[in-house]
């Protein structure tokens, strides 16, 4: 029973309604014949048949009765519908009275008659259920049908009482009046059947079907234009549950119905005969089914072979019949013909199709001219009829069939809203009634769908009219519905939008979760429409806020979908508008309460809240950090779960975790508001025991309640560690592992307080993080992917740079190095090594080198008692270079040592394998005392032998027993190791050997250079200057002092004889300068012979001048005695100086009578010089004296006396040529530089080193001196041994839209945070005097400014191109911006400082710059910064690097450090991408290859004789060294050996062409306000001195040898300082 309907039983004209008392068969024949005739009139025109209003009135009354026929007569009803359709839309068939219908009477009657088809019907009970296939084809819906005589008892599970069913059916089939007899004769439409499967009776109330109506419509319409509402009764089953929305029937169904017409009853009779033959079988089957089936509902079906078919309309669940049997014809018809068996479902589908045909006519009328030509009264009357129809079909208390309602609902509602909006009614009564009755329709899903579509159609022009200028000048606005458009005035649009929006009432009152979710979805679309044109979040919340807040705050079981949508809407509103408006406090309070409630839920509510609130802490929303405790609970629930299949949820959770990491360091003791005092955070699952390693490394347990920010620190640590152990997505792991670095950087700050127990914040965390990474990376089960392991190794390499602030660094470093060594040793055992494995081993070797090089920790601590780490390093690197692990051959080495000791022979194991089968072959490696054997490798495990060892390899044990001799095998080489791995291992070993604890080096060198800048030309100039100073020789041939050699193919050495020092020209002070060029750079070393300990030379000690070699011929014998010339020289020296000082020995003597001569070998050179003394001769010469006395010759005596007197006088005059100290003087020092060959000390040095021995002849190769060779050396010096990176820094103000706007910014117009950031990037150096890497900055004209930030470590150099520090005027080109663009756009990675939101930059400015990777920095409040790495689409999937992999919020004090690391790693990823196969070479490898090319191209092959003569002969004039810095390279020059290094490539030294597998650690990053480096000069902030822009050399204490630094003209400045 429909209550409060808008229908009324009208009083009809007395002259009408005569057909109401006719039998059904008569009415059927009359309607059929009349309508069929009018559809196809003889003359083809209806206007000549229906000429008067009376005729039209009579025909319409007949047609009205056609609409009231039973549904079984659907073909006749369809013809009636087609007749009205022709009259309405076909002018040719439109009757004349209908054309002249000025008062629209007949049009109203047509609309009313069409509504009769929607009258609830009772469907007959003769249903064929015997066909099982029909049951399968049906929609398996159970239909409970009641008849018109209140057969409720039969519906209440009276399924087993067939007698009662039959009685009820008989009573139902009873008809009143004259129809009783006819109904008893016509058994076909009143078949009584008891369905065994349904258990309920189905009957047709003939009185209700055939006689009931003398009304103009099923609503009862009279002639009045505005009938009052009155309820109408109808008897059908009420709808019990909502169904899936359906789509309207297409116009093609009409053709299907018409095609099924037949000519007479012949077909009917044939069908009846076939059915009668099967009737008995069907009845038996029905009885069996009744016993088997216990369901109280009816399963509908069709008769086997029937013409009725079921089809599913596209996009709809509605089942419609494809054809209807033509039961009647114009030639033969009998009311006694038995109708075929028809299922209820087919009848309902037929009814649905008829109703849909009517609704299509209504739509066509509303979209055509009728809606514009009808009067307001007619339109409102039409609206009332549509409202009544809709409520009758869809209302809560409706008696219409549920399936019929489900089939008609979508098209019915669409028609209602279109007709209603086309009418443009302002009648408040109608609108109020629509609002009232619509509340009873929302239990149908299509109702919500149609409401959503209508609201969205009205909202689109509404927001454009209010917030844009599109409709400002228009008086009307076009509303675009599904298939039509309507012109509205603005005022009516606003009125209709508000009315339609509030039809739904409060969506939270909807009882169905699915419909509630659909309603919230519609609200979401409306809110999104508003947000697309306005940022006024308060206005949007005024409209929708109450609905959404209630939906989210009231958590109802089963409504998760709608609640999650409500949470998404709130987050969408607040996060998108937070930076543009201030929300009202009441809205903020409600928002935080709702989101907090959602975060304490599980399932879809929590998932959607996390996903859509990932940017909540970077949005600038006031007070958003009050939600942190709730987010911690949610992150605990998500990140600690094992094996989740929702990587997107975990990605957003990890992003939120990154937004919280920095906050405890900023707000330590600030308290939180507790939304839910009774709720506590669930305890974290325990971490694996193998990552803790002792109680002292256990993390502090997080508290159950979070009261302050300090309480967050252990929670964050546990979340990171737990997520590392549970995360399965590689993409998420690439972001998560870098949180270890952020946590370490944030909490290693000096102002961070330790825990109450005294432990540092990061001590336990960093230890367990390292253990977790190493456990996952070295796992044999491949728990992490290849990309994740590579990124993890990069992280470990970068952590080494923080060694000074990592707690327990020695322990952590030992753990990292030991486990990586085991990892490398294990991976090198693979027989078929994949490229991924090669990358892992290479990066592992480089990571080991980084941890070893940063400090001498490997030699500290317990090194004296535990050397396992030390040996493991070289074991792993040797295995990576192709050697065999000593652990694998220790047994064979032990047996070899024992056998060798028995024969008196021992050898150092060269890695040979006892089981290799090659041990019987002798090695060709030569040996010699003092020789250099670069190819031999000694095994540390064989060092236990106490006997002298010789170069060789361990061989088979049987060799020692064969004749007492031992044959050395060939060295073991692992052929499975790729050349790439070997090269990287060699480079790592070279870095350890040459760079350990060597940056910055201890010789007052600056971070600018790690290689010497001294060249051969500088030293030649120094020698010439000293020769002119000491000897007065101009143009001293110092070029003869140079010789170039190659040691193997990896080292180029230059030996230079230095005959003079800066203060002396004594031969004893001469020395040799060695310039060594290898893969690690260039080193300059001075070597000097020393026979006594060096002492600090005083300034007053002046060397004795070199004596002319021709005037000082001194015998070098042991008993030498000075000659006269020598005595004169010595005498002159004594008379002038009284003391003679030599370079190495000071010889003193005292005067006596006699000087006994003593051999030199009797004296110790360390003792004081010997002292001679005169001793009296007491020998007896008596006989000779007496003889002389007897034979005295006076003359002779006189002569003797005179001679003696003269001598006496002479001696007296010369003081007898005697002094108190008389000694034998040593040989006078000689010089060997007077000849043409100046190579003297260098030859001695090479001899002592064993290079000139015949055994080592092939180790040292002289190189040809030529201009091309000297130019190649200059090119080699220009190849840096460190990675060189150019980093552009671009400042973008809010509002900048073009490149010119951006590049016009200068430092003075920037913010203080930006200036602090620039200051913290590196050291500010002057461009004109800087000696380090500058990229393409102009040093000559200073086009790019005078200063630039520079930063360097032991493995890389960085120069920053700061756009705001560059002038805006280019003098050379007279261009204001072009010089900046050319410089900055050359790089692939840039850093963008944007004073706005990242989302705005990504939408508007990302494509402004050509860089493939852009790291964007946006400042937040309280010294916090939001960072995000934006990648161009062409590279986004292959360039995920850290630390800023996706998005993070960090503090100010770590900003510069994070940016440097991110740029370095991003450059490395681009290098890997540009190399094609993803394999880039180590930076050392480029130098090594170039050295090999130079050696092969310029080696000088000599015979043995020529080789030795080469060291004594002077060079030809063409072979003398030339300074070729300014000479162009010959275009036709090519290396003999093919090389991958392009000698003529100008930009070869840039970072884009030099890759590295390592990410070496920089020194401690500068603070926010960096202090000047101690090496900076006061003039420009550079390490350059005021004289020449170089570093002043100093000699370390305790050394006399001068380690030449990087400055030319070194000794000249020293000489000037002594003047």
UniProtKB/Swiss-Prot annotation:
Segments of this protein annotated with the region Disordered: 128-249, 289-316, 907-974, 1134-1153, 1554-1619
GO cellular component terms listed in the entry, alphabetical order: cytoplasm; macropinocytic cup; plasma membrane; protein-containing complex
Compositional bias ranges of the Low complexity kind: 130-204, 231-249, 916-926, 934-965, 1574-1590
Residue pairs linked by disulfide bridges in the UniProt entry: none
Membrane-traversing stretches: none
Residue stretches making up the Rap-GAP domain: 1273-1494
Entry keywords, A to Z: Coiled coil, GTPase activation
Biased composition regions of type Pro residues, renumbered to the chain: 1559-1573
GO BP annotation list: regulation of macropinocytosis; regulation of small GTPase mediated signal transduction; small GTPase-mediated signal transduction
Compositional bias of kind Polar residues: 1591-1619
Protein name as it appears in the record: Rap-GAP domain-containing protein DDB_G0281809
């Amino acid at each position: 029973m429909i209550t409060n309907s808008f229908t009324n039983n009208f009083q009809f004209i007395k002259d009408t309604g005569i057909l109401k008392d006719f039998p059904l068969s008569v009415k059927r024949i009359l309607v059929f014949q009349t309508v069929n005739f009018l559809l196809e009139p003889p003359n083809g025109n209806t206007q000549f048949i229906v000429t008067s209003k009376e005729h039209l009135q009579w025909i319409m009354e007949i047609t009205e009765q056609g609409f009231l026929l039973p549904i079984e007569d659907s073909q006749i009803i369809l013809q009636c519908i087609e007749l009205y359709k022709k009259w309405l839309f076909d002018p040719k068939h439109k009757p004349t009275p209908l054309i002249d219908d000025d008062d629209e009477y007949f049009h109203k009657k047509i609309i009313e008659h069409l509504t009769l088809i929607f009258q609830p019907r009772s469907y007959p009970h003769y249903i064929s259920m015997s066909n099982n296939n029909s049951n399968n084809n049906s929609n398996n819906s159970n239909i409970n049908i009641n008849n018109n005589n209140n057969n409720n008892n039969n519906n209440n599970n009276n399924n087993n009482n067939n007698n009662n069913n039959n009685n009820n059916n008989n009573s139902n089939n009873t008809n009143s009046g004259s129809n009783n007899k006819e109904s008893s004769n016509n058994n076909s439409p009143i078949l009584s059947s008891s369905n065994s499967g349904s258990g309920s009776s189905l009957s047709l109330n003939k009185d209700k079907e055939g006689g009931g109506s003398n009304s103009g419509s099923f609503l009862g319409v009279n002639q009045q234009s505005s009938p009052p509402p009155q309820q109408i009764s109808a008897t059908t089953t009420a709808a019990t549950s909502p169904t899936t929305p359906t789509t309207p029937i297409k116009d093609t169904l009409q053709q299907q119905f018409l095609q099924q017409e037949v000519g007479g009853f012949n077909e009917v009779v044939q069908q009846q005969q076939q059915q009668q033959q099967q009737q008995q079988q069907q009845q038996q089957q029905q009885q069996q089914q009744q016993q088997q089936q216990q369901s109280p509902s009816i399963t509908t079906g069709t008769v086997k072979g029937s013409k009725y078919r079921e089809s599913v309309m596209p996009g709809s669940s509605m089942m419609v019949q494809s054809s209807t049997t033509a039961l009647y014809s114009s030639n033969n018809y009998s009311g006694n013909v038995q109708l075929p068996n028809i299922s209820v479902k087919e009848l309902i589908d037929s009814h649905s199709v008829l109703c849909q045909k009517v609704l299509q006519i209504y739509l066509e009328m509303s979209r055509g001219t009728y809606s514009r030509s009808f009067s307001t009264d007619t339109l409102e009357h039409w609206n009332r009829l549509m409202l009544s129809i809709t409520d009758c079909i869809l209302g809560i208390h409706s008696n219409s069939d549920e399936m019929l309602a489900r089939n008609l609902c979508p098209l019915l509602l669409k028609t209602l809203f279109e007709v209603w909006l086309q009418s443009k009614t302002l009648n408040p009564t109608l609108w109020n009634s629509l609002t009232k009755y619509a509340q009873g329709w929302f239990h149908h899903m299509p109702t919500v769908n149609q409401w959503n579509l209508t609201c969205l159609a009205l909202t689109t022009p509404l927001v454009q009219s209010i917030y844009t200028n599109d409709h400002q000048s228009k008086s009307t606005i076009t509303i675009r519905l599904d298939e039509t458009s309507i012109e509205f005035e603005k005022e009516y649009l606003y009125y209709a939008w508000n009315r339609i929006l509030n039809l739904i009432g409060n969506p939270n009152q909807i009882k169905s979760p699915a419909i509630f979710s659909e309603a919230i979805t519609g609200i979401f679309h409306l809110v999104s429409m508003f947000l697309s044109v306005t940022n006024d979040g308060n206005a949007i919340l005024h409209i929708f806020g109450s609905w959404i807040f209630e939906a989210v705050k009231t958590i109802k079981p089963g409504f998760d979908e709608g609640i999650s949508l409500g949470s998404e809407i709130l987050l969408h509103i607040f996060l998108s508008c937070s930076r543009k408006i201030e929300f009202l406090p009441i809205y903020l309070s409600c928002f935080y309460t709702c989101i907090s409630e959602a975060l304490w839920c599980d399932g879809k509510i929590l998932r959607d809240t996390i996903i859509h609130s990932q940017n909540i802490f970077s949005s600038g929303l006031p007070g958003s950090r009050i939600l942190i405790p709730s987010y911690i609970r949610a992150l605990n629930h998500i990140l600690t779960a094992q094996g989740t299949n929702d990587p997107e949820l975990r990605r957003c959770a990890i992003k939120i975790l990154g937004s919280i990491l920095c906050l405890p360091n900023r707000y330590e003791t600030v308290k939180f508001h507790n939304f839910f005092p009774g709720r506590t955070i669930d305890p974290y699952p325990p971490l694996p025991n193998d990552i803790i390693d002792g109680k002292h490394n256990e993390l502090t347990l997080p508290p159950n309640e979070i009261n302050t920010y300090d309480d967050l620190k252990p929670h964050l640590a546990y979340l990171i560690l737990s997520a590392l152990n549970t995360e399965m997505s590689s993409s998420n792991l690439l972001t998560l592992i870098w949180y270890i670095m952020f946590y370490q950087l944030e909490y290693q700050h000096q102002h961070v307080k330790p825990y109450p127990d005294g432990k540092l914040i990061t001590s336990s965390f960093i230890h367990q993080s390292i253990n977790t990474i190493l456990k996952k990376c070295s796992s044999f089960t491949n728990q992490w992917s290849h990309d994740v392991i590579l990124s993890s190794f990069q992280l470990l390499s970068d952590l080494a740079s923080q060694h000074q602030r990592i707690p327990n660094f020695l322990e952590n470093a030992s753990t990292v190095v030991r486990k990586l060594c085991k990892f490398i040793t294990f991976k090198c055992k693979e027989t078929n090594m994949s490229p991924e494995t090669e990358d892992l081993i290479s990066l592992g070797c480089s990571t080991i080198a980084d941890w070893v090089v940063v400090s001498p920790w490997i030699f500290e601590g317990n090194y004296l008692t535990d050397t396992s780490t030390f040996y493991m390093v070289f074991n792993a690197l040797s295995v990576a270079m192709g050697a065999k692990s000593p652990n694998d051959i220790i047994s064979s080495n032990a047996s070899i040592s024992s056998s060798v000791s028995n024969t008196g022979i021992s050898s150092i194991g060269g890695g040979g394998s006892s089981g290799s089968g090659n041990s019987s072959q002798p090695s060709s490696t030569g040996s010699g005392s003092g020789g250099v054997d670069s190819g031999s490798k000694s095994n540390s495990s064989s060092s236990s032998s106490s006997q002298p060892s010789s170069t060789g390899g361990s061989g088979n044990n049987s060799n020692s027993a064969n004749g007492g001799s031992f044959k050395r095998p060939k060295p073991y080489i692992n052929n499975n190791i790729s050349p790439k791995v070997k090269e990287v291992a060699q480079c790592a070993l070279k870095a350890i050997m040459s760079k350990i604890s060597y940056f910055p080096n201890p010789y007052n060198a600056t971070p600018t250079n790690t290689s010497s800048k001294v060249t051969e030309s500088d030293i030649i100039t120094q020698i010439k200057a000293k020769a002119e100073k000491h000897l007065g020789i101009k143009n001293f041939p110092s070029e003869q002092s140079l010789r170039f050699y190659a040691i193997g193919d990896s080292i180029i050495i230059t030996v230079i004889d230095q005959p003079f020092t800066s203060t002396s020209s004594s031969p004893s002070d001469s020395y040799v300068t060695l310039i060594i060029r290898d893969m690690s750079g260039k080193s300059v070393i001075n070597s000097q012979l020393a026979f006594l300990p060096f002492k600090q030379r005083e300034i007053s000690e002046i060397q004795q001048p070199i004596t002319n070699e021709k005037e000082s011929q001194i015998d070098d014998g042991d008993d030498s005695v000075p000659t006269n010339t020598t005595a004169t020289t010595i005498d002159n020296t004594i008379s002038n100086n009284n003391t003679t000082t030599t370079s190495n020995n000071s010889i003193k003597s005292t005067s006596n009578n006699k000087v006994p001569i003593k051999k030199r070998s009797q004296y110790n050179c360390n003792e004081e010089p010997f002292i001679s003394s005169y001793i009296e001769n007491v020998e007896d010469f008596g006989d000779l004296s007496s003889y002389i006395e007897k034979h005295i010759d006076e003359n002779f005596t006189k002569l003797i006396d005179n001679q003696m007197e003269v001598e006496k006088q002479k001696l007296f005059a010369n003081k007898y040529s005697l002094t108190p100290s008389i000694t034998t003087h040593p040989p006078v020092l000689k010089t060997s530089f007077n000849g043409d060959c100046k190579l003297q000390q260098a030859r001695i040095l090479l001899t002592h080193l064993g290079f000139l021995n015949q055994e080592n002849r092939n180790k040292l190769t002289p190189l040809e001196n030529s201009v091309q060779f000297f130019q190649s050396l200059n090119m080699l010096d220009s190849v840096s041994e460190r990675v060189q990176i150019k980093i552009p820094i671009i400042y973008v103000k809010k509002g900048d839209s073009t490149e010119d706007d951006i590049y016009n910014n200068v430092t003075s117009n920037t913010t203080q945070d930006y200036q602090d950031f620039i200051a913290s990037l590196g050291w500010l150096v002057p461009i004109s005097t800087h000696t380090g890497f500058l990229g393409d900055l102009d040093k000559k004209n200073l086009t790019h400014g005078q200063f630039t930030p520079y930063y360097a470590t032991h493995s890389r150099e960085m120069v920053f191109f700061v756009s705001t520090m560059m002038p805006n005027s280019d003098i050379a080109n007279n261009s204001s911006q072009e010089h900046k663009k050319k410089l900055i756009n050359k790089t692939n990675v840039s850093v963008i400082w944007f004073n706005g939101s990242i989302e705005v930059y990504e939408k508007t400015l990302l494509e402004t710059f050509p860089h493939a990777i852009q790291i964007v920095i946006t400042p937040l409040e309280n010294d916090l910064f939001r960072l995000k790495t934006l990648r161009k689409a062409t590279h986004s999937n292959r360039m995920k690097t850290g630390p800023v992999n996706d998005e993070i919020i960090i503090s100010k004090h770590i900003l510069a450090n994070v940016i440097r690391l991110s740029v370095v790693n991003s450059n490395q990823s681009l290098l890997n991408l540009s190399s094609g196969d993803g394999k880039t070479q180590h930076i050392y490898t480029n130098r090594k290859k170039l050295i090999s090319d130079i050696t092969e191209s310029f080696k000088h092959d000599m015979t043995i004789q020529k080789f030795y003569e080469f060291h004594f002969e002077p060079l030809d004039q063409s072979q003398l060294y030339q300074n070729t810095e300014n000479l162009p390279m010959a275009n036709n020059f090519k290396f003999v050996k093919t090389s991958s290094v392009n000698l003529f490539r100008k930009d070869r030294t840039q970072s884009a062409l030099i890759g590295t597998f390592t990410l070496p650690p920089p020194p401690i990053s500068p603070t926010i306000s960096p202090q000047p480096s101690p090496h900076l000069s006061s003039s420009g902030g550079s390490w350059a001195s005021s004289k020449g822009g170089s570093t002043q050399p100093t000699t370390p204490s305790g050394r006399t040898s001068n380690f030449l630094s990087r400055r030319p003209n070194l000794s000249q400045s020293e000489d000037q300082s002594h003047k």
